[in-house]
């Protein structure tokens, strides 16, 4: 878990505040998709113990953490497991994910430009994130301000327009926040 451990040690206070705010978006009985990002993984620290949910995830770590809650039904999407992220990827995972429906997808991203282009270098996982967004009534982007950059890198994953809400910290670039407002995307800014 060296990769996930190293990601989870960056901007810890921000990630925890973002994760805590994300919990407020859950309703008992919801069917949700939980992404494999370190910010999304922090949600388990704040979930009410007895909340009833159905959680689907490709993250092996998240599946095990959510499975500790008595009223959370966990569906772990299978497939080839990445050595770096400890999450499933590939055609088996994609096919299953495309057959499901979620009220909300909580998505973490590695990189987003000020104008809202989301990119990644994790080619196997890009298709899964796209499918989760497509299969969800609502998609929420969870990202600390360190993810915002000037230029895109690698492969396009999505755009800001694919999300109904962004939860980020108070150090987020003002041009990025203005872009969210212009696109009428709900923004929740948290203080670490």
Name the predicted role of every residue range:
Residues 2, 6-13, 17, 38, ...:
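Residues at secondary-structure transition points
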Residues 41:
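Glycine-rich SAM-binding Motif I of class I
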Residues 56-57, 190:
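An N-terminal domain-start capping segment
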Residues 63-192:
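Conserved phosphate- and dinucleotide-binding cores of soluble alpha/beta proteins
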